[in-house]
Amino acid sequence: MPNEQAISGLVGVRSAIGVGAWVAPRISGRLFGLDVPGNPQAPYLARLFGARDAALAYGLQSTQGAARAQWLKIGIACDIADALAGVFAGRRGELPAFATVLVTSTALGAAALGIAALQGEQA
């Protein structure tokens, strides 16, 4: 995959998830299989997550070279942390199996795309 395609994909996914989580946190939560009605704090947490993803998208979109590579590394670290959080929550019974798979696979997919883009930046 050419590097600019990977960057564009990451910017698009992060923007969509970030804006979606901020603007419609309950809908976004349900799309990921979360029990939004059972957790009245979920919209607040979704908006925190949404702001982070939107900031990561902006950082990638607005930089080049070494600065862009740094944003990619930050995003990869966040994605790996998100994947681990999904696994831990699933193992502890804090997430249903379906939600565990969705949140973990989404985070791992974003991390893989970030790694591919980072390799392209360093080539």
Per-range role (PLM):
Residues 1-123:
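Short amphipathic, positively biased membrane-proximal segments
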